[in-house]
Amino acid sequence: MSKIFAYTVGTLGTARETVPYAYTNSAWKDQLTSYDGESITYDASGNPTNYLGATLVWEGQRLKSYTPKDASSGRANSYVYSYDENGIRTRKTIGSTVTDYYYNGTLLMGTVKTTTNSDGSTTTSKLRFSYDADGKVVAVNYNGNYYYYLRNAQSDIVKLIDKTGATVVEYRYDSWGKLLSTSGSLASTLGKNNPFRYRGYGLRDLRLSCLLSGSSFTVGWSRTLLMLS
């Protein structure tokens, strides 16, 4: 059975923005070498090593460290990552803050974030996650209280609510998954530390890319960054 759809033809408006993409590697023709006039360099495995003055160091396809342009002047912190033998991240260090990740198999069960303050004291934040029978995260325990994840039709985490149903965190994304805003009474604490957001995937906050289904996909570039087997 066929259907006929009627379309109208209008005049295209003026482009709001033009962003040039360049592919100048003759040996790897689909490798993005420049985005909006900013060059991107790679190692022999196709991992990006420099972009916007930032330096990325890789061990195979595991990102070991990310150093922003301003790190040398002390205006930004470097990111250092540790992994287990299966390539799952177990620790993230950003300046004086260390976050440890705990798993049951491949399920992230909890995180412990410890910050060493200037006076030598430490501040600790703990998150413990609960899952349903299908392995989908449904709740998080933060400071002894449970909060529950709400998703939209695309499985994006859009809210966290407390036991009364009140919204404590709300996320807004654009169509590419870039986080536009975080609001709510716990936005700066639970909202910031919660690793589950777009599509419900665990956040990989590399500042350059986010991990989606095994491919490193840059939100700004709207394309796959790494060639993964």
PLM feature spans:
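Beta-turn initiation residues at beta-strand->coil junctions
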Residues: K3-L12, T33-E38, T49-A54, S65-S72, ...
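Tryptophan-centered short beta-strand motifs
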Residues: L32, R75, T122-T124, R223-M227
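A cross-taxa feature marking solvent-exposed loop/turn segments within ectodomains of secreted
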Residues: G74-A76, A166, L206, V219
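Aromatic-rich beta-strand edge motifs centered on tyrosine
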Residues: M1-Y7, G13-Q31, E38-N47, A54-K64, ...
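Short, hydrophobic/aromatic-rich segments at coil-to-beta transitions
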Residues: N86-R91, L107-G110, N194-R197, S209
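A motif-centric feature for acidic-aromatic and gly/ser/thr-rich catalytic loops and repeats
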Residues: V19-N25, Y142-L212
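Acidic, proline/serine/threonine- and glycine-rich low-complexity intrinsically disordered segments
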Residues: S209-S229
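Predominantly a core beta-strand signature of beta-propeller blades
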Residues: V137, L179, R223-L225
